[in-house]
A protein has these predicted regions:
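A sequence-composition feature that detects small, non-aromatic residues
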Residues: 11-12, 20-22, 31, 36-37, ...
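Glycine-centered secondary-structure boundary/capping sites
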Residues: 109-112, 162, 166, 193, ...
Length: 686
């Protein structure tokens, strides 16, 4: 008996040694071939890759060995915990997609991240299963199903969000969550994709299978301890391994690989994220505000921070130089909804030329900025950047004494008007906008309806009615000094619930299934009609400037990723149009069309154009002025700062404890410092 048992042990040991040897030689050959073409041969990178691969194989062998030792129990556990198995398979499929999308390696730390993520995402379902099998009842079965179904639906929602944004669900999703937002997301799917989603939901329901209650009940305490222990072990191994890996790379002198590894680590963390927990926390808490609050203690930038900000062109040593006299008496800003720069044919050949002929003609004829980026998303944050030259918006901070483009213009004799297509109650706009941005006159959907206008659906009034109202108001104000802003909505998903008739659509894209193209054709037509009517009404003259721009770039939608081909321009902060239209463009002759700029730059530019000194709290630059520092564009979304210039671009996580570069740490400090200063009462600003 002992001889037989010893023989089995020896056989198992020999089998393990053979497998281990085969794995080593296979991985060694693979690692050597990976660097064979490089001269001189990079020994450090070779060993780093080989050790990484072997550690991954060890982890997989351990997991496989544990499953083998418990192989007799596997059929029973598969039946008893089948819904959790379904969730696990869904997660593994999602993890595989994330790895491909984020270009993650398949080595040791990625494997640990997937194991941690697997346990994090099936943990609630396993607990519900243990509870049900311990106390079988109809109510507990319903609870089991609810936990399973909610986890599956949240995972589906996160998959869709990641597909559109390459991020897990963010808090901003819930700040704009309503029936129209849901319709907007759904409108971005084709019929086949909607059927696939419906099939997914139906499959999730049908795959909920539980065995009949058994006489032998699971030991709830032991089951909880085992599941919790394994989950904690996987997470501890992953996060410890991440830090040890960075330390090892640093000590071994592999500096470049260390910097790359820091970026990979952020992406790997997404694999380990408990999806349901993330979505629930983002729905209940605004992490961005938590990050901001923790940084309030930092009230000054260090000399090193300032040095980097000057090098990056984020800060400038020269003060803005306003013109000696106002260039215009009237400025009209037409703000489009969610329009990317590359939704215009002139910038993107994927858009048919017949879809945006008027916008193309304006771009060729008038001054514009070709590399003009959103500074924030969504609408309120984008308008905050436009009107207050700030990256971060906090509606809970009193804004009555805060500087803005409207307030500065109104203090110098210009009347301020803001016309919104949406309801005044949406996102508390009526209170927020007048308090934070300071326009003297605010008009929203309800006001237009009282004035007898019709033509609203979905989010609000359509472009044609908005422009008709604008023209009528401008006629009443003819000869006066004003700053008039019209904020449209028609490119907000779902669209087109408005549009030209099929027979009036150009044949070249009449049958085009990409609705964004049809939406942009409608935008183009309504703008053409607006400017034609303005010309006929005598509203186009040497003392009037019209500006066409967008509130922010589109942040989601399958068509967005289809139409915009350049990866850099599909980030959460991306280029939007900025066009200046006037019969007198001489004051704009110093504008460089190719410069890099963002929404925080438009307010100081317009004030300087009007001979008004911008408030010191404005962080943008005057685009009509030449600075010694380089030009740059700056944005913020989802606790990340986005930087763009002619020679570099990067994304900086604000609360990153170990930034890759000094300039990233400096930019994070700048963002939080300017947020702190922007919230100070007027008397406390130095």
């Amino acid at each position: 008996m002992n001889l037989t048992r010893n023989g089995k042990r020896i056989a198992a040991l020999l089998f393990f040694l053979v497998v281990a040897g085969a794995v080593y030689f296979w991985e060694e050959e693979h690692a050597r071939l990976l660097y064979a073409a490089i001269t001189p041969f990079p020994e450090g990178d070779y060993w780093e890759t080989l050790v990484n691969a072997l550690l991954r194989d060890v982890v997989l062998l351990i997991v496989g060995g544990l499953l083998f030792l418990r192989r007799k129990r596997i059929p029973d556990r598969l039946q008893r915990y089948f819904p959790a198995v379904v969730l696990g398979i869904l997660y593994l499929g999602f993890a595989w997609y994330m790895c491909g999308k984020l270009a993650l390696d398949s080595y040791f730390l990625t494997t640990l991240a997937i194991l941690a993520g697997l346990m994090n995402n099936i943990f609630p379902a396993i607990l519900a299963a243990v509870w049900y099998h311990r106390n079988p009842s109809r109510g507990n079965k319903l609870l089991y199903f609810a936990v399973y179904f909610v986890c599956a639906l949240l995972m589906l929602m996160d998959m869709v969000y990641f597909w559109q944004t390459t991020m897990h669900v963010q808090a901003v999703f819930f700040r704009n969550f309503n029936i129209y937002a849901i319709e907007g997301v759904m409108s971005s799917f084709s019929r086949n994709q909607l059927m696939e989603i419906g099939g997914f939901v139906l499959g999730v329901i049908l795959l909920f299978r539980v065995t009949k209650p058994r006489r032998h009940k699971p030991n709830a305490a032991w089951a909880l301890l085992a599941v919790l222990g394994w989950t904690l072990c996987c997470n501890l191994l992953y996060y410890t391994g991440s830090q040890v890996g960075l330390y090892a790379l640093h000590e071994s002198g592999l500096w470049s690989e260390e910097q790359i590894e820091k970026s990979r680590q952020e992406y790997r963390d997404m694999l380990a994220t408990p999806i349901a927990g993330n979505i629930i926390s983002k729905a209940l808490f605004n992490k961005e505000k938590v990050v901001m609050a923790t940084q309030h203690k930092k009230k000054e930038l260090t000399d090193k921070d300032r040095e980097w900000m000057y090098k990056l062109g984020v800060m400038r040593k020269a003060a803005p130089h306003p013109l000696p006299v106002p260039a215009y008496d009237r400025i009209v800003m037409l703000i489009l909804e969610s329009v990317h720069r590359d939704y215009i044919h002139c910038y993107n050949s994927e858009i048919p030329a017949e879809a945006t002929p008027f916008l193309d003609s304006l771009i060729k004829q008038y001054p514009r900025i070709d590399n003009y980026y959103s500074s924030a998303v969504p609408t309120t944050e984008g308008l905050n950047a436009t009107f207050r030259s700030q990256l971060l918006f906090d509606g809970d901070v009193d804004g009555n004494d805060k500087p803005s483009l409207f307030r500065s213009m109104q203090e110098h004799g210009f009347d301020g008007y803001f016309q919104s297509a949406s309801s005044r109650y949406y996102n508390n706009e009526f209170r927020q906008y007048m308090e934070q941005f300071g326009m003297a006159h605010y008009e929203a959907r309800e006001d237009l309806e009282k004035a007898g206008y019709s033509g609203a659906s979905g989010w609000g009034f359509h472009n044609d009615e908005m422009y008709r109202r604008t023209l009528e108001q401008l006629k009443k104000l003819k000869g006066q000094k004003y700053f008039y802003v019209t904020k449209t909505l028609d490119m907000h998903q779902p669209y087109p619930y408005y549009a030209t008739k099929w027979e009036e659509t150009p044949e070249s894209f009449r049958n085009n299934q990409i609705v964004t193209v049809h939406g942009m054709y409608w935008v183009d037509c309504t703008l053409r009609n607006f400017f034609k009517a303005a010309e006929e009404a005598g509203l186009m003259d040497d003392r009037t400037l019209y500006i066409i721009t967008s509130d922010h770039n589109p942040h989601s939608g399958g068509e967005y990723t289809q139409l915009v081909k350049k990866e850099q321009d599909r980030l959460s902060v991306a280029p939007i149009p900025l066009i200046f239209v006037s019969k007198n463009t001489a004051p704009l002759e110093n504008l460089d069309n190719s410069t890099y700029a963002s929404q925080i730059d438009i307010a100081p530019t317009l004030l300087c154009l009007q001979g008004i000194k911008p408030p010191e709290r404005f962080i943008g630059r005057n685009l009509l002025q030449q600075y010694r520092e380089k030009e740059s564009a700056l944005g913020f979304f989802g606790d990340k700062a986005y930087y763009f210039s002619r020679d570099m671009h990067f994304v900086d996580k604000i609360d990153e404890p170990y930034p890759q570069h000094e300039y990233e740490d400096a930019l994070a400090n700048f963002v939080m410092y300017t947020y702190y200063v922007s919230g100070l009462p007027a008397g406390e600003v130095k």
